[in-house]
């Protein structure tokens, strides 16, 4: 059930971004329109009373699963159309509303179908399967689309990029024209050189930026891709930075009293190399050949920074299409990566992928239609006239805010993860930033190993263990240990910021410890939301709790990056530790039944 809950979310948030990028949609349009897909999950508490008042949660679950499957099939059918972007965005938006409604019903069904101690025992399993869905969506679906794409179109062309520590810096020459003779053989992609060697000596950032700008202008003038950003568009930093005279005075105060003693100046960038691509002969008139460059294997510290998608036709087939590869400035050893240039049928690949997704959801619909139980408590709570419905609708909201000690409960929801909400935004930048800037200077590949492998495994383990121990001794017994453990992350990263260890296994262990603590401690938070939602309208009230949960994560994360830039990593992690205090103060005011969450057999022994 929770695997099915996670798939639509990852489709809307991640998979759609990759799909549109592969189809040549500009970054500006992707960022703007896919951001709107998040809206239904933000505002879902507004219609949660409808799910609680009308029909059963079981019916809502199977109906929305069927609807999601139909909408995913609709996406697959509209991808080949000329205006696919407009059609698919509209359908995905409807899918997002259906998925948010499915979330409301699934959470309510979980609380109605399980005893209190079972809810505690399975809360870790629930979150684990949700995360498995996230991993499957971001991995398996994208791999499937890539395999189909690679099996169609022109034969793929592989490029090998190698970092060479002993290679001297070489000036990058950009060809203006190519002397290409049309081949009588089959249409193929030609890449020169087939093996690109890049020295590991960092170059001037200004020089690298200048070359990248020239490459983009060349590709634009030769018609290989459209401009993605207007010259007057503001950077994300300009848009996100707080403004105003009082804010500037606050910045000056923080920088003067809490900022790092000396701001590191980072004026070096990873070295780059250029590969030229063209076709072996002109394609048929009117045919466009979209060549997509992507990593096939190798070290993630070598990346493609320009020329991801190049469109050839009979007018530019023999002009130089330029692809730029860059190595991580922290990379000092010989590594290699293989990139593959493919020209498969991108739309066909993603159509098939979405048909597979649709089949998965139709299968889930059939499975849950026959397998899901019929809890006696799962019954509609409203009937009669529209006037009575409106009365019930507003009564649901009123009942939530009329609960005993609701102010303390809401404060706990907002403050429990105040420290973690700030920390999670800066973990990856801290791991990646140069040591001169206060970070750990890891390569992209190593961050993926530390955070994406060891961290995820520890997170799942913490969630499973947290659910188990609460089912044995109850939420009240484990609340304070979980509060302490979830806030270990601040101490972990404070240690890393001051010591800046060179040992990669030590860094991996520290990241795993922080993620384990987060998974273990978050179990208490989820159980407390279930406790607050107890009562007549638990489905709608749980949805309201998740709304406050989202707010508690969103607001602190908005200013955390701004604050870190002012005071540096060391003082930022000290600040994170200080922000654990409000949550602890509110936690001391909570009134929790000692038996809540405890398995009945365990409670009977006492």
Labelled PLM ranges:
Residues 79, 83, 87, 115-128, ...:
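Intracellular loop-helix junctions on the cytosolic face of multi-pass helical membrane proteins
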Residues 477-525:
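C-terminal transmembrane helical hairpin of 12-TM major facilitator-type secondary transporters
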Residues 62, 66-83, 484-502:
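C-terminal ends and interior cores of transmembrane alpha-helices
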Residues 42-56, 461-480, 564-565:
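Helix-to-loop junctions at the C-terminal end of transmembrane segments
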Residues 25-39, 348-349, 435-458, 505-506, ...:
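Loop-to-transmembrane helix entry
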Residues 133, 532-566:
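A late C-terminal transmembrane helix in Major Facilitator Superfamily
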Residues 1-41, 407-412, 416-436:
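Helix-loop boundary and gating motifs at the non-cytosolic
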Residues 16, 101-114, 520-534:
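Intracellular juxtamembrane helix-capping segments at the cytosolic ends
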């Amino acid at each position: 059930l929770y695997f099915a809950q996670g798939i639509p979310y990852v489709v809307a948030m991640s998979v759609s971004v990759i799909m549109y990028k592969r189809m040549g949609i500009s970054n500006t349009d992707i960022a703007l329109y896919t951001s709107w897909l998040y809206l239904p999950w933000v505002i879902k508490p507004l219609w949660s009373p409808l799910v609680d008042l009308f029909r059963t949660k079981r019916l809502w679950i199977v109906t929305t699963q069927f609807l999601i499957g139909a909408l995913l099939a609709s996406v697959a059918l509209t991808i080949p159309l000329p205006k696919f972007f407009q059609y698919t965005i509209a359908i995905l938006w409807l899918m997002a509303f259906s998925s948010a409604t499915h979330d409301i019903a699934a959470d309510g069904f979980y609380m109605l179908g399980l005893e209190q101690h079972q809810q505690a025992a399975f809360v870790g399993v629930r979150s684990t399967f949700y995360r498995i869905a996230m991993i499957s969506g971001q991995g398996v679906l994208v791999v499937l689309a890539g395999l189909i794409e690679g099996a169609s179109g022109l034969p793929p062309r592989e490029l090998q990029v190698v970092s060479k520590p002993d290679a001297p810096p070489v000036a990058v020459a950009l060809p203006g024209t190519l002397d290409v003779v049309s081949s009588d053989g089959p249409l193929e992609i030609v890449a020169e050189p087939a093996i690109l060697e890049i020295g590991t000596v960092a170059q001037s950032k200004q020089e690298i930026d200048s070359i990248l700008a020239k490459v983009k202008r060349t590709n634009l003038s030769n018609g290989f891709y459209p401009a993605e950003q207007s010259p007057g568009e503001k950077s994300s930093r300009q848009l996100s930075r707080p403004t105003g005279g009082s804010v500037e005075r606050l910045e000056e105060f923080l920088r003067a009293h809490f900022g790092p003693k000396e701001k590191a100046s980072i004026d070096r960038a990873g070295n780059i190399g250029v590969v030229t691509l063209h076709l072996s002969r002109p394609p048929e008139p009117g045919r466009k050949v979209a060549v997509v460059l992507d990593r096939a294997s190798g070290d993630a510290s070598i990346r493609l920074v320009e020329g991801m998608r190049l469109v050839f036709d009979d007018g530019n087939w023999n002009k130089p299409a330029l692809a730029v590869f860059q190595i991580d400035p922290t990379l000092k050893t010989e590594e290699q990566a293989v990139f593959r240039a493919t020209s498969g049928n991108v739309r066909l690949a993603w159509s098939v992928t979405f048909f597979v997704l649709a089949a998965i959801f139709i299968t889930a619909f059939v499975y849950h239609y026959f397998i899901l139980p019929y809890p006696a408590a799962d019954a509609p709570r409203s009937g009669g006239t529209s006037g009575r419905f409106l009365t019930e609708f507003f009564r649901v909201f009123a009942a939530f805010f009329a609960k005993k000690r609701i102010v303390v409960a809401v404060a706990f929801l907002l403050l429990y993860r105040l420290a973690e909400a700030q920390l999670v935004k800066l973990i990856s930048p801290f791991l990646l930033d140069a040591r001169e800037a206060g970070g750990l200077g890891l390569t992209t590949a190593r961050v993926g190993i530390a955070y994406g492998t060891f961290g995820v495994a520890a997170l799942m383990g913490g969630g499973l263990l947290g659910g188990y121990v609460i089912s044995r001794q109850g939420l009240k017994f484990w609340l304070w240990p979980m509060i302490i453990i979830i806030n270990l992350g601040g101490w972990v990263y404070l240690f890393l910021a001051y010591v800046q260890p060179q040992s990669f296994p030590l860094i991996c262990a520290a990241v795993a410890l922080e993620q384990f603590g987060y998974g273990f401690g978050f179990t208490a938070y989820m159980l407390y939301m279930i406790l607050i939602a107890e009562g007549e309208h638990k489905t709608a009230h749980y949805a309201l709790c998740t709304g406050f949960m989202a707010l508690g994560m969103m607001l602190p994360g908005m200013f955390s990056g701004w604050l870190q830039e002012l005071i540096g990593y060391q003082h930022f992690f000290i600040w994170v530790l200080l922000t654990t205090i409000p949550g602890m103060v509110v936690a001391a005011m909570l009134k929790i039944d000692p038996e809540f969450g405890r398995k009945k057999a365990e409670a009977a022994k006492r």
